[in-house]
Structures are given as C-alpha cells and as structure tokens.
Amino acid sequence: MEKVNFFEEVEKTLNISFNDKELIDTALTHSSYANGKKGVKFNERMEFLGDSVLQLCISEYLFLIYKSKSEGELTKKRSLIVCENSLYEVAKKWNIGKYIKMSKGEEITGGRERTSILANCVEAIIAAIYIDSGYKKTKQFIIDNFKDIIEKAIKNQIVLDYKTNLQEIVQQDGDIHIEYMLIKYEGPPHRRKFYTKVCVANNVMGSGVGYTKKESEQNAAQDALKKLKSEDKWNKEGIDTNEK
C-alpha cells in the first residue's frame, strides 16, 4: 500500500485527521518490524503515554458523569474499560490489525490477531492523537470509541478473559498444552463452589475458585498469569515450561 493511501485509509477508519502523519505511522509499527532496520521508530514508548492518557480520560469521564459512585466503584469500572480485552475489542472494531507493520515471522504466528499487539496499538494511537491534537480532542475520541465498553462496564457486562491471555502467552513458542482440571466442588446446588487448577505442559501453574466452572477456570488462569510474571517466566520470547 502506498504511504499516502495508507494514511488516508487509517484516518478514515479512525475518523480523525493527523497533522503529523509520522505519528500514526509510528503508532502502527510493531517492534518486530524495526528489528535490524536502522532509524525505524516503533510504538512501545507511545503505548506508555497512551495508557496514561486513556486512564486520565476515563477517570475524568467517570468522575464527572457518575457522581454517586464511590472511589472503589469508579476504580473497578475504569479497570474494566481500560483492560487489554476492552482495548482489543476497540481494535477489532477498527480492523486495525491489517494496518500494523510487523515482521513476517510475527505475522505468520498470528500477530495481526494477537490480543496484546492490537491492544497496544490502541494505546499508541491514543498517544499519537494526544501529541498531535491535544487533550480535548483525544478525550472526545476516546469517549466516542469506548462508549459501548463504558456502558457495558457500568452494567457489569464485561468479563476479563484471562484464559485467552494465558493461552496466547504460553503458545508463543508452539502448541503447548493447557489443561483445566476440576479438583472438587462443594456446597448446595444453588450455591455450589468449584475448585479448578490449570496445568501448562503438565505443570500446575495456577488454581482458582468460583461459583461456576467458567469463573473458577478464569480465576485459575489469572492466578497462573500472576505466577508467571512474579517468577519471571513470562517474557516477550515466551515461557519456560521445562521446570518440574
């Protein structure tokens, strides 16, 4: 795609114009594309800024609109709105994956559909708009594009999909087997509690409890993700599954 057409398509998709076109170019450049290319900028620093701008805009919006909600309630709603899965939903709505510059290897392994890559691009795009047009325009852009997610968060209709996140991370290095095993359940039928463990490559990586099997599996996946991070087994190259 020619560069002029690229910018026009992206601006049309986002319904916004950029004064500095290079900002959106950088926002849509994955680090894998820049490897070995001297002087090519990629979007990781912009992700950092975009994350902060998004948090501020959503915080201000919730604070002004929902005056009766407590600090704890507002914090919980914000975390749902700005979580990776919500950003992924926005990215899919834009179909932004097709515009991302990435290495052939990243593309072959499903990079254009990867939750983390798409979510990071949304943050980088927000940063690009903020740098190019300032806070007021960025806030309006965020509210316009996140309004459905904000509404779902207020209605408690957002579920954090930790299982998908765990699967994407551990399978970066190949088709590594993940298994969720129901350990036991207890309590009456109307208030039954389920206990689940998750195994990655036959290693127990996390456990979770919930009032449905699905909830207990999500909590087990969340526990596994926390352990992978804290034990430094999770990194950009994948996960060490050889430990016993």
Swiss-Prot record:
GO biological process annotation, one example: tRNA processing
Binding site for Mg(2+): 47, 120, 123
Location of this chain's protein in the cell: Cytoplasm
Enzyme class: hydrolase
UniProt GO MF annotations: double-stranded RNA binding; metal ion binding; ribonuclease III activity; rRNA binding
Swiss-Prot/TrEMBL cofactor(s): Mg(2+)
Primary subcellular site in the record, as a coarse category: cytoplasm
InterPro entries per UniProt: dsRBD_dom (IPR014720), RNase_III (IPR011907), RNase_III_dom (IPR000999), RNase_III_sf (IPR036389)
Keyword terms: Cytoplasm, Endonuclease, Hydrolase, Magnesium, Metal-binding, mRNA processing, Nuclease, RNA-binding, rRNA processing, rRNA-binding, tRNA processing
Cellular compartments per GO CC: cytoplasm
Protein task: Digests double-stranded RNA. Involved in the processing of primary rRNA transcript to yield the immediate precursors to the large and small rRNAs (23S and 16S). Processes some mRNAs, and tRNAs when they are encoded in the rRNA operon. Processes pre-crRNA and tracrRNA of type II CRISPR loci if present in the organism.
Family: Belongs to the ribonuclease III family.
Family annotation (HAMAP family): RNase_III (MF_00104)
Name the UniProt record assigns to this protein: Ribonuclease 3
Organism: Clostridium kluyveri (strain ATCC 8527 / DSM 555 / NBRC 12016 / NCIMB 10680 / K1)
Gene: rnc
